[in-house]
Amino acid sequence: MARNVEEPAYTVVDTYALFEVRLYEETIQARVRTDGQHYSNATGGFRRIAGYIFGGNQRNQRIAMTAPVHMWAEDGAHWMAFTMPSSLSMEQLPAPNDEGVSLVPNLAGHLAVLAFSGRSHPEKVAKKSQRLLDAVKAEGMEVAGEVVLAVYN
């Protein structure tokens, strides 16, 4: 992880053998629907959002890169998101030039997190996702929402 790269703020609420529960603060994300059936095919989505933060917006404004890059599948589509710097409000963010890039509030909430390292190939992501879901259910918790892959460089 590079130094001086902002990450979403959170508090660890509880720690279990295989995962921890974190309470994340509200953020704003730049999101795009990506092509392909797997996270590994998301290069086009990455380029589109990177284009937005590197000045592809109505003010030609550069926006600081944050970590991680979020990827998930929902309703038969794959999505990618970059979290916007916490110093910028929705009103301060310039509109994207690319109509496929949307600025979306990401509400505060609790997330179960299973950290792992290495490449995020589809088989590994599927295995880790299932392991997380099984561990959460084994602790008697209800799963709500989709599994989100958070990729750090």
Predicted stretch roles:
Residues 1-153:
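A solvent-exposed interaction/effector surface
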